[in-house]
UniProtKB/Swiss-Prot annotation:
Homology family: Belongs to the ninF family.
InterPro entries: NinF (IPR008712)
Gene: ninF
Protein name: Protein ninF
Domain of life, per lineage: Viruses
Species classification: Viruses, Duplodnaviria, Heunggongvirae, Uroviricota, Caudoviricetes
């Protein structure tokens, strides 16, 4: 079982982790959730157009 000081430290660390980007670890802006704007743009980009369906050759 955690002591009161260990419990407070765990809570503090949990809050800090929740306020950082899951991809790069940068502190998140108030309106950002899970990833920062830069990582969101990188992760959501589609450089190979793989998200677009190819036309059927039928």
């Amino acid at each position: 079982m955690l002591s009161p000081s260990q419990s407070l430290q765990y809570q503090k660390e949990s809050v800090e982790r929740a306020l950082t980007c899951a991809n790069c670890g940068q502190k998140l802006h108030v309106l950002e959730v899970h990833v920062c704007e830069a990582c969101c743009a990188e992760l959501m980009s589609d450089p190979n157009s793989s998200m677009y369906e190819e036309e059927d050759d039928g």
